[in-house]
């Protein structure tokens, strides 16, 4: 009931000018889509500020594409649903949008925005994103069914990850889209038991995009960035929501993709 009352005021059908300017100033976007069976995938697109532009409130142009070996690249076809997140960690600002891919070319993507909304600044760890002038792409991504012990250690030490979810319906209702959101907390806020991750669901905006999607479609895509090395850890997972209190999210990993030195960005801690 609360969401039905608040939603129309905060979830917009187009991006206001301040959000368009914000997204255009970002050196990276977190972006998600789904495969043909509804499995969400999430990754990062990077570029110099201005590589994303918004000619109006309902359209975005991205001058760039995911890396050719990133599953996102093969899935972001015209008509595909997308969710995206623009985030400025040192100010804790973030904005989300979803919609459909209009067109793609060798140079980039054209997107139609169906929904746009701001997001709670809680639990964002303050960092500055900087381009590494000496960056060279790392080894090809390694794929496997489960986590290595080194990856379990990485996850236990993480203070940030991103989760992509999707409504199971592919109809024209803008609420039936793909969503990608930020999850953060102090190192150790994620528990790891074999290939199962556990996260307490902290209070935020109470939009319930993530949990609402997972109740209808338990598939999730996860992304853990290594802010020091620019590596990415992608995971497919199946979710279970434990009502609590506290409400808790269990994510059973079904696939792993570890891409060393995938990004030209490095992050430095910023003053809190």
Regions found by a protein language model. Name each.
Residues 1-272:
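Binding-site signature for planar aromatic cofactors or substrates
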């Amino acid at each position: 009931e609360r969401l039905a009352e608040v939603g129309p005021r905060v979830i917009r059908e187009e991006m206001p000018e301040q959000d368009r300017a914000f997204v255009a100033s970002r050196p990276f976007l977190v972006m998600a889509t789904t495969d043909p069976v509804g499995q969400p995938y999430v990754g990062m697109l990077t570029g110099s500020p201005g590589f994303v532009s918004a000619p109006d409130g309902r359209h975005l142009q991205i001058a760039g594409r995911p890396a050719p070996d990133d599953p996102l690249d093969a899935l972001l076809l015209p008509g595909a649903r997308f969710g995206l997140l623009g985030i400025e960690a040192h100010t804790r600002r973030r904005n989300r949008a979803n919609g459909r891919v209009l067109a793609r070319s060798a140079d980039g993507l054209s997107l139609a925005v169906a929904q746009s909304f701001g997001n709670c600044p809680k639990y964002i760890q303050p960092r500055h994103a900087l381009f590494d002038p000496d960056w060279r792409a790392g080894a090809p991504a390694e794929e496997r069914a489960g986590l290595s012990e080194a990856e379990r250690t990485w996850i236990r030490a993480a203070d940030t990850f991103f989760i992509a979810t999707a409504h199971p319906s592919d109809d024209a209702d803008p609420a039936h889209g793909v969503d990608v959101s930020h999850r953060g907390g102090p190192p150790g806020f994620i528990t790891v038991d074999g290939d199962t991750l556990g996260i307490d669901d902290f209070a935020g905006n109470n939009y319930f995009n993530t949990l609402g999607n997972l109740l209808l479609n338990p598939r999730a895509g996860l992304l853990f960035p290594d802010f020091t090395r620019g590596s990415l850890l992608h995971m497919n997972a199946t979710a279970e929501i434990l009502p609590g209190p506290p409400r808790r999210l269990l994510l059973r990993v079904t696939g792993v993709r570890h891409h060393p030195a995938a990004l030209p960005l490095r992050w430095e801690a910023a003053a809190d």
